[in-house]
Swiss-Prot record:
Protein name: D-alanine--D-alanine ligase
GO CC term, one of those recorded: cytosol
Pfam family for this entry, one: Dala_Dala_lig_N
Cofactor binding, note field: Binds 2 magnesium or manganese ions per subunit.
Assigned keywords, A-Z: ATP-binding, Cell shape, Cell wall biogenesis/degradation, Cytoplasm, Ligase, Magnesium, Manganese, Metal-binding, Nucleotide-binding, Peptidoglycan synthesis
Organism name: Bacillus licheniformis (strain ATCC 14580 / DSM 13 / JCM 2505 / CCUG 7422 / NBRC 12200 / NCIMB 9375 / NCTC 10341 / NRRL NRS-1264 / Gibson 46)
InterPro entries per the UniProt record, alphabetical: ATP-grasp (IPR011761), ATP_grasp_subdomain_1 (IPR013815), D-Ala_lig_Van_CS (IPR000291), D_ala_D_ala (IPR005905), Dala_Dala_lig_C (IPR011095), Dala_Dala_lig_N (IPR011127), PreATP-grasp_dom_sf (IPR016185)
Binding site for Mg(2+) 1: 299, 312
Pathway: Cell wall biogenesis; peptidoglycan biosynthesis
């Protein structure tokens, strides 16, 4: 019997287009002998629109946008058990949901919470891990509690900054110095990130970052290599080989990731056995610190002095075939289609485990 897999993508997020690219790649890779593929598009206005079941790959993202041709529906009908005896609801129901959403409302625990309430199995991290992994400040606090070495940072609220800009800038200069990186606390794909070398650039960077979030984080500039590992699993996570990001630009921004191709991905990264083992151990600890499940990509700095610093974990990493996470697993012996199937299996495993939990006493 085939698995009815709901692909949820798009969303009210600055990473809407990234999500569309991910959905396109996944639809091309899925085996229609194993899965009934049901596309569910969230428009930029936040409307849920369901398209027809996909029986063959689509060629471009426009074919996955159903504002004009799809059927608006309530996500509540994803669970057939909530609508016993209703034929339409049963037809709409899904066995497993794969949220292919990046950024706020998709990667931050929001949709995960909805799916938990509906008791629908879903791929990837749960509410806690997703929200902690989205908020860079909370994430860094958890890493510190877990004893993971990381770069120095400070964080600011927009209200604090608007009332005392000069004091904020002085704190950055006093505690971190230049260069430093300014980032929205709750956004990915390098959206809204700036590298600063002066007070003037710092002011511009704060202005930009606060357009995307009410909270930002400023990190010290680290001189060294950027290394990433993929983590896969639930309670017994395993790691992929390591990969290195070698941007041809000053840093790995949104354009370098998704538009220009001005970045070399070196897989496997050239590391000593001790360096890899340190990163592997830290990646697992970071995964466990946020209570991860399914997948994360763990990002590290390897300084010129040989110090390993964890930068962040991404709970829904870029997932196109040319993204780092799938490429890491391909080099580790897991092809793209198999990776998707493993993630679906992990989602079902976790859901079945949760069903054994008692809710009465």
């Amino acid at each position: 019997m085939k698995t009815r897999l709901g692909l949820v993508y798009g969303g009210k997020s600055a990473e809407h287009n990234v999500s569309l690219q991910t959905a396109l790649a996944v639809t091309k890779a899925l085996d229609t002998e194993k899965f009934d593929i049901h596309p569910i598009y969230i428009t930029e206005k936040g409307e849920w629109v369901r398209g027809p079941q996909l029986t063959e790959p689509v060629s471009n993202v426009k074919m996955l946008q159903f504002e004009q041709t799809g059927q608006t529906f309530s996500p509540a009908v994803l669970n057939r058990d909530m609508f016993p005896g209703e034929a339409d609801a049963k037809e709409d129901s899904i066995d497993v949901v794969f949220p292919l959403l990046h950024g706020p409302n998709g990667e931050d625990g929001t949709i995960q919470g909805m799916l938990e309430l509906l008791n629908v199995p879903y791929v990837g991290n749960g509410v806690l891990a997703s929200s902690a992994g989205m908020d860079k400040v909370v994430m860094k606090h958890l890493f510190a509690q877990a004893g993971l070495d990381q770069a120095k940072y400070v964080s600011f609220l927009k209200k604090t900054w608007s009332q005392s800009k000069e004091e904020c800038y002085a704190q950055v200069e006093g505690e971190l110095g230049y260069p430093c990186f300014v980032k929205p606390a709750n956004l990915g794909s390098s959206v809204g990130i700036s590298k600063c070398r002066s007070r003037e650039e710092l002011d511009q960077a704060f202005e930009l970052a606060f357009q995307y979030d009410r909270k930002i984080v400023v990190e010290e500039g680290v001189i060294g290599r950027e290394i990433e590992l993929g983590v896969l699993g639930n309670d017994e996570p395993v790691c992929s080989v390591a990969g290195e990001i070698a941007p041809k630009k000053d840093f790995y921004d949104y354009k370098a990731k998704y538009e220009d191709g001005d970045t070399d991905l070196i897989i496997p990264a050239s590391l000593t056995e001790d360096e890899y083992e340190t990163m592997r151990s830290m990646a697992v600890k970071a995964f466990q610190a946020i209570d991860g499940s399914g997948l994360v990509r763990a990002d590290f700095f390897l300084t010129n002095e040989g110090r390993v610093l964890i930068n962040e974990v991404n709970t829904m990493p870029g997932f196109t075939p040319f993204s780092m996470f799938p490429l890491l697993w391909k080099q580790s012996g897991v092809e793209y289609a198999e990776l998707i199937e493993k993630l679906v299996a992990l989602a079902i495993e976790r859901h079945e485990e949760k069903q054994q939990i008692k809710h009465t006493f």
